[in-house]
């Protein structure tokens, strides 16, 4: 899988949320990674919820051909953690 992202946005994401997009690629190592279509009106995007080092993280991505473009990553909200931990997915 090929990841793409804006390096400046990755740096800003690290400053704001404590994780850059390079480290966020580790979400895909989580066998329980949850992927949900995000509510958008323009480009198709997905919300991913997974764990890195036992912490829940949420990412917004889009797909460009075979590539995955990281748009943002942050610590998961409480309701996202509940969704991740749910067996109803």
Question: How should each PLM-predicted stretch be described?
Answer:
Residues 1-89:
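Ribonuclease/tRNase effector modules and their secretory precursors
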């Amino acid at each position: 899988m090929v990841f793409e992202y804006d390096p400046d946005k990755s740096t800003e994401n690290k400053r704001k949320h404590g994780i850059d997009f390079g480290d966020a690629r580790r979400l895909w190592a989580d066998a329980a990674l949850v992927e949900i279509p995000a509510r958008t009106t323009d480009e198709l995007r997905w919300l991913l919820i997974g764990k890195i080092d036992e912490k829940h993280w949420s990412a917004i991505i889009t797909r460009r051909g075979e590539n995955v473009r990281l748009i943002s990553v942050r610590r998961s909200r409480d309701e996202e953690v509940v969704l991740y931990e749910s067996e109803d997915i």
